[in-house]
Amino acid sequence: MNAAPTVLQQQAQSLSEAVTQPIPGSRKIFVQGSRADLQVPMREIALTRTPTLFGGEENPPLSVYDTSGPYTDPRVAIDLAAGLAPLRAQWIAERGDTVALDGLSSSFGRGREHDVRLDAVRFPARRLPRVARQGANVTQMHYARRGIITPEMEYVAIRENQRLEAVTDASLRRQHPGQAFGASIQQRITPEFVREEIARGRAILPNNINHPESEPMIIGRNFLTKINANIGNSAVSSGIAEEVEKLVWSIRWGGDTVMDLSTGKHIHETREWIIRNSPVPIGTVPIYQALEKVDGRAEALTWEIFRDTLIEQAEQGVDYFTIHAGVLLRYVPLTAQRVTGIVSRGGSIMAKWCLAHHKENFLYTHFEDICQIMKAYDVAFSLGDGLRPGCIADANDAAQFGELETLGELTKLAWKHDVQTMIEGPGHVPMQLIKENMDKQLRECGEAPFYTLGPLTTDIAPGYDHITSAIGAAMIGWFGTAMLCYVTPKEHLGLPNRQDVRDGIMAYKIAAHAADLAKGHPGAQVRDNALSKARFEFRWDDQFHLGLDPEKAKEFHDQTLPKDAHKLAHFCSMCGPHFCSMKITQDVRDYAAEHGMSEAQALSTGMQEKSAQFVAQGAQVYRAT
């Protein structure tokens, strides 16, 4: 092994120290499936006993969905230079429909492999890619349509249920009825339901056969709402070690998938490090790398260059590709009257190519050729919205909806090849126009999963667009969007750092959970109920641990009440000891219990006592003291 990977590995040691400790108050557990090698990870939050004053009962631990992979499991030794264990390798091999290649198929990949100048940044462990056998289709959709329940499907069924059956306290399971807008929300997710949804095209299970390290997950409106985090280096900022760190940081806080949007140098090598160390699906926009190969000249792009890029990335293990095949020549003039024109990088690249050659988008004309590649590796389509609105003034215009109609046409073509497909959506949309987007997408695209960037509901808050977009994300998630692409505070301003990534993920975890509550997803309210109970009982540590960001909650509390004794206090610094509404409520309950009366009677008695006291003191509103 050369010295350079060791340098990267040394840089990664700080990553391990910073982000690999368990989430406070919890531990990694595994739920056993039907076979010995099917163990589904979850995070179990330990809860303390209710204080005697409030009843003194035990509070059993609560299991929640976990995206952090082995990084938060202290029993696992992390070696970024070796990558993660190939969790699905045996499942893939057992199906007998893939073969290992002797080497890389793409000409670009082969060139990088033998370039000694790249030794300093190359991932050290060599791995031979796999591909479908001649004439075979290896997509999860293909299996689902043939009635096959794969281990991946069983895995996600167990994962989606979050051990809800272990919650026996009826007060924790209490939940408001949801409004699902026609979604088929199940009380319990079964492997058969997962298979049906994938076969129907309403859900995707993005798992490239060359990314066996990934833990299966599902994207669909009848499942938990997912979020995506974007990372990626650029020509002016960020390197490989930093991007791997951002990957681990993203999944620690709840990123269900991660998109590598790298546009700078060493795109290929950065992606290899990311995929080999990622337990979540990785998405890319292949046109970005294809453009790098022609020195940034969109007009110089060719189908051959793009095809080679697809194969290169598919053999590395990319799980889904954003492909802007709906940017048609006839739609480009429709953007001329927009305030912000075409804001999608991929959309602008393809629009420029179309105008330069005055030909139809080659991604559209070669779409079935692309399908042949996708089904040979089980790469899912994320059909890009290259004409999405870049400001609320441009929302829901002819260009945006024309492209959406074309994406619906392409979805049906992809399904003909059993290729898993989701649809990307806006963007910038005011609140009153959001539902129209969702309804049209369901209608035009046959209920294929919708994957939206926000949408941002106003354009006046640079520096706070994680908030402007989380508002729209919560709404469109409720209406039926399956996955929300996060927006960070740096949106429109610069490349996000680690704190920006965390802030963006938190905003979107809130939006996704709010959507699940509104849809009435089974068990969605359990965690809310558990936290509310802990709050009323002044179990401060449990409040922190049940929150989406335990570290932030504890940090804020300890800024004013830092002592250990304050974790037992029946108040916080907001109201203090004499004005805490929950403490007052408990005092009323205690008074009622002491005097053998109901809470209503206690309140009435207390009011009568105060009335008598007022009259006895002279019935004066103001008294000299």
Swiss-Prot record:
Enzyme class: lyase
Pathway(s) served: Cofactor biosynthesis; thiamine diphosphate biosynthesis
The protein's Enzyme Commission number: 4.1.99.17
Catalyzed reaction equations: 5-amino-1-(5-phospho-beta-D-ribosyl)imidazole + S-adenosyl-L-methionine = 4-amino-2-methyl-5-(phosphooxymethyl)pyrimidine + CO + 5'-deoxyadenosine + formate + L-methionine + 3 H(+)
UniProt keyword Iron, yes or no: yes
Highest taxon of source: Bacteria
One example GO MF annotation: zinc ion binding
Residues at which Zn(2+) binds: 428, 492
Cofactor note: Binds 1 [4Fe-4S] cluster per subunit. The cluster is coordinated with 3 cysteines and an exchangeable S-adenosyl-L-methionine.
Gene Ontology CC, one term: cytosol
Keywords: 4Fe-4S, Iron, Iron-sulfur, Lyase, Metal-binding, S-adenosyl-L-methionine, Thiamine biosynthesis, Zinc
Cofactors: [4Fe-4S] cluster
Any single Pfam family the record assigns to this protein: ThiC_Rad_SAM
InterPro entries in alphabetical order: ThiC (IPR037509), ThiC-associated_dom (IPR025747), ThiC/Bza_core_dom (IPR038521), ThiC/BzaA/B (IPR002817)
Chain residues that bind [4Fe-4S] cluster: 572, 575, 580
Binding site for substrate: 230, 259, 288, 324, 344-346, 385-388, 424, 451
One Gene Ontology term from the biological process aspect of the record: thiamine biosynthetic process
Subunit structure as annotated in this protein's UniProt entry: Homodimer.
Family: Belongs to the ThiC family.
Functional summary from the UniProt entry: Catalyzes the synthesis of the hydroxymethylpyrimidine phosphate (HMP-P) moiety of thiamine from aminoimidazole ribotide (AIR) in a radical S-adenosyl-L-methionine (SAM)-dependent reaction.
Protein name: Phosphomethylpyrimidine synthase
